[in-house]
UniProtKB/Swiss-Prot annotation:
Site (Cleavage): G14, F15
Organism per entry: Escherichia coli (strain K12)
Pfam families recorded: SRP54, SRP54_N
Domain comment in the entry: Contains an acidic N-terminal A domain, a central N domain and a C-terminal GTPase G domain that can bind and hydrolyze GTP. Contains at least two lipid-binding sites. The first site contains the first 14 amino acids (helix 1) and the second binding site is an amphipathic alpha-helix located at the interface between the A- and the N-domain (helix 2).
Residues bound to GTP: 300-307, 382-386, 446-449
Annotated knockout phenotype: Deletion affects both cell morphology and protein export. Mutants are defective in the insertion into the cytoplasmic membrane of three topologically distinct membrane proteins, MalF, AcrB and FtsQ.
Cited Gene3D superfamilies: P-loop containing nucleotide triphosphate hydrolases (3.40.50.300), Signal recognition particle SRP54, nucleotide-binding domain (1.20.120.140)
PANTHER family: SIGNAL RECOGNITION PARTICLE RECEPTOR SUBUNIT ALPHA
Protein name according to UniProt: Signal recognition particle receptor FtsY
Catalytic activity: GTP + H2O = GDP + phosphate + H(+)
UniProt feature, compositional bias: Low complexity: 87-96
Amino acid sequence: MAKEKKRGFFSWLGFGQKEQTPEKETEVQNEQPVVEEIVQAQEPVKASEQAVEEQPQAHTEAEAETFAADVVEVTEQVAESEKAQPEAEVVAQPEPVVEETPEPVAIEREELPLPEDVNAEAVSPEEWQAEAETVEIVEAAEEEAAKEEITDEELETALAAEAAEEAVMVVPPAEEEQPVEEIAQEQEKPTKEGFFARLKRSLLKTKENLGSGFISLFRGKKIDDDLFEELEEQLLIADVGVETTRKIITNLTEGASRKQLRDAEALYGLLKEEMGEILAKVDEPLNVEGKAPFVILMVGVNGVGKTTTIGKLARQFEQQGKSVMLAAGDTFRAAAVEQLQVWGQRNNIPVIAQHTGADSASVIFDAIQAAKARNIDVLIADTAGRLQNKSHLMEELKKIVRVMKKLDVEAPHEVMLTIDASTGQNAVSQAKLFHEAVGLTGITLTKLDGTAKGGVIFSVADQFGIPIRYIGVGERIEDLRPFKADDFIEALFARED
């Protein structure tokens, strides 16, 4: 009855609850921001607390129904209930204990519970599950943070690796430039020994069949017919040619009997002299003095290196202090005009050219007129590559020569045939037919460094007697050198001890 008197009449009728309800609603509204910040794992705890708050309300309704009949006694105690109403309100307010709920929430949000505290406190299963889920979420967040840190480290490692690779990629060019500079310094030295060493390296493949390759053939043998047969076979393998080989063998046989040679190694020296005499007949450098302009007409088959040889010759003449002009007479091959123009741009040399497909004779005619007007020292005219067995193309070449003679009776002052040394005995056929068509006055032998068929130079020199002006032993401009028979023979027969 004491509890019933304390609650009062208005509380049984629900007046006290109406006054408490706004207060609870305001408190709940104030707690909503706090509750929204709580982790999802704490929702079961909130549900249990709400259930505890709803129990007093249900109990109050049951008691109200039980004492509804005793209205008379309640009316007599109105005065007492009015006095007790403030106390009831005071007592009813702390029952939900709403203010105490944020304290553990705030503690859990600011500081995570330690495992020792969890074990020491008696926690309900729902709270234990909520805390376990909270710990799992925190651990997952820490793992993600750790992964992010590892990712940053991996990124730094990757950046360092890329920087190292870039450093590695930058280093080799610097290492490669040093040998190039050293080679350039060696080339600048006009000493005979420097070029001789380079010539020996370029003739390594040819020396396998000629020159020093004969040492093993002659060593420890007697001079007899078997030795000459082996020598003849070796000369034919080196593309010296049948006629030139027979001539060499005949002269060696006569010389050996005349000098009464018995040692095969002595025959090796005699062979060197014999082959040196063949090349000495064609050792005649090109002289461009006395003519203005000195016109050089370049002829040859396709792909032997005419245009490249023109660019190298132009550079060498310019280094000698002569003014040079180029004529792009190869109007048939695609990009031939552009190729010659590139050589002109590299060396600051003027190039006379027309569109592709134009008449080659007209281009060269215009070039001769321009060279005379500008007082050019040397004019080098390019022509389209043509096979020696194409009669109509050879007739076109004759037409070019006739057109040139209209401006200068002595032009062209040099008709230079470019021969690829790797073609072997086909070079003999080229020299024969081009010589019959336009009358060759010089020969340039290219690509000697990449073939074992360099013996063709002896066949061409022996059969035609046309001066060999230049030999190409490499790709650089300096690798196109004036031909010197003595240097060539010495490099060919140099012994590798």
